[in-house]
């Protein structure tokens, strides 16, 4: 078969597929209208840079996991706030029945516009998620958490009954069903997950996430979030130092990390990140405990500079813009980069 005959045969096959399944069901990759991946900011400047595309990708599955009280829900609430700022409609499937509306509001979430569901079973939660995603009107959906997606058979059974891998089977089936809808509707789907310990592990990390292996395969981005220290004002703890690691990334190079502060009652400290990244990129000068911008001293001590940037949003936005511009040109901004990861 000559090249011309091959081209004609392919064109005829493509026309037949489009006739059967609709226009856009098959195409050459270069013909796709959106080659660039759209994203939504995470609310953390450092994490946006670590993800490589300025946030989490649209139309993909995201998994955020970590130990208890590490900031998983805080990060997802910031994601919702950022999506709503862009005019997006968001939904929150609260399988843990633990969402605090007052805290969500403090983080910038418009709770009047947030769709919330508190399902009774894992099947109900995932069916609700599927219906919302298929509607095409939802820009972001959060499922909190995979561990709380309890199968109906387990809820209706007796305490102590052996339910062999029922949750893993449920997740595997649901993700097979959801993936195509998520991509077609461009909906960001975020699963919050918890960590468990594997018994009898001699080598490597004993940590694993709940719900089987399906989510690890289907997720385009997996973010590991950990609390690494406390922030104190004299003796009072006012926040936590947090480290995030992008352990899987299908849209940019993975294994990058970012550090930020989560302040109690107000969430991720944007000003703290601007200072740290500004110093790393030589936008802010640091001499001893003094910080300067454009050769003008802006404060002594990190907490004082954070307050200065809060009081002067124009300068804060100016430095943030410079950080984003400079970080896109610099391949290494002293972010740690891991070479391997344990599930």
Swiss-Prot record:
Ranges in a coiled coil: none
Binding site for ATP: 66-73
Annotated GO biological process: DNA recombination; DNA repair; SOS response
Cell location: Cytoplasm
PROSITE patterns per UniProt: RECA_1, RECA_2, RECA_3
Any one GO molecular function term: single-stranded DNA binding
SMART domains: AAA
Keywords assigned: ATP-binding, Cytoplasm, DNA damage, DNA recombination, DNA repair, DNA-binding, Nucleotide-binding, SOS response
Keyword DNA damage: yes
An example Gene Ontology CC term for this record: cytosol
Domain of life: Bacteria
Key word DNA-binding present: yes
Principal cellular location given in the protein's record: cytoplasm
Its job: Can catalyze the hydrolysis of ATP in the presence of single-stranded DNA, the ATP-dependent uptake of single-stranded DNA by duplex DNA, and the ATP-dependent hybridization of homologous single-stranded DNAs. It interacts with LexA causing its activation and leading to its autocatalytic cleavage.
Similarity comment: family membership: Belongs to the RecA family.
Protein name according to UniProt: Protein RecA
Taxonomic source organism: Rickettsia bellii (strain OSU 85-389)
């Amino acid at each position: 078969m000559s090249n011309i005959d091959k081209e004609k045969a392919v064109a005829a096959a493509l026309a037949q597929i489009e006739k059967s399944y609709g226009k856009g069901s098959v195409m050459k990759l270069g013909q796709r209208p959106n080659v660039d991946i759209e994203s939504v900011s995470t609310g953390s400047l450092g994490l946006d840079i670590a993800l490589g595309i300025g946030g989490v990708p649209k139309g993909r599955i995201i998994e955020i996991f970590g130990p208890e009280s590490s900031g998983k829900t805080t990060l997802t609430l910031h994601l919702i706030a950022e999506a709503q700022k862009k005019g997006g409609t968001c939904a929150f499937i609260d399988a843990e029945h633990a969402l605090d509306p007052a805290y969500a509001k403090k983080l910038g979430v418009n709770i009047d516009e947030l769709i919330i569901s508190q399902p009774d079973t894992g099947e109900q939660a995932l069916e609700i998620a599927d219906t919302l995603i298929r509607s095409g009107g939802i820009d972001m959906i959060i499922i909190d958490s995979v561990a709380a997606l309890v199968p109906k058979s387990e809820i209706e059974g007796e305490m102590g009954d052996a339910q062999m891998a029922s949750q893993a089977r449920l997740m595997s089936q649901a993700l097979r069903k959801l993936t195509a809808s998520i991509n077609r509707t461009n909906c960001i789907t975020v699963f919050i997950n918890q960590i468990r310990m594997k018994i009898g592990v001699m080598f490597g990390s004993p940590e694993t996430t709940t719900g089987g292996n399906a989510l690890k395969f289907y997720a385009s981005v997996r973010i590991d979030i950990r609390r690494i220290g406390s922030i104190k004002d004299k003796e009072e703890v006012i926040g936590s130092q947090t480290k995030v690691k992008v352990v899987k990334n299908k849209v940019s190079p993975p294994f990058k990390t970012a550090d930020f502060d989560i302040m109690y009652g107000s969430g991720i400290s944007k000003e703290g990140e601007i200072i740290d990244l500004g110093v790393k990129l030589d936008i802010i000068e640091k001499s001893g405990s003094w910080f300067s911008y454009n050769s003008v001293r802006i404060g002594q001590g990190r907490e004082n500079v954070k307050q200065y940037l809060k009081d002067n949003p124009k300068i804060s936005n100016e430095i943030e813009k410079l950080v984003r511009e400079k970080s896109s040109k610099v391949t290494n901004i002293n972010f740690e980069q891991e070479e391997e990861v344990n599930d």
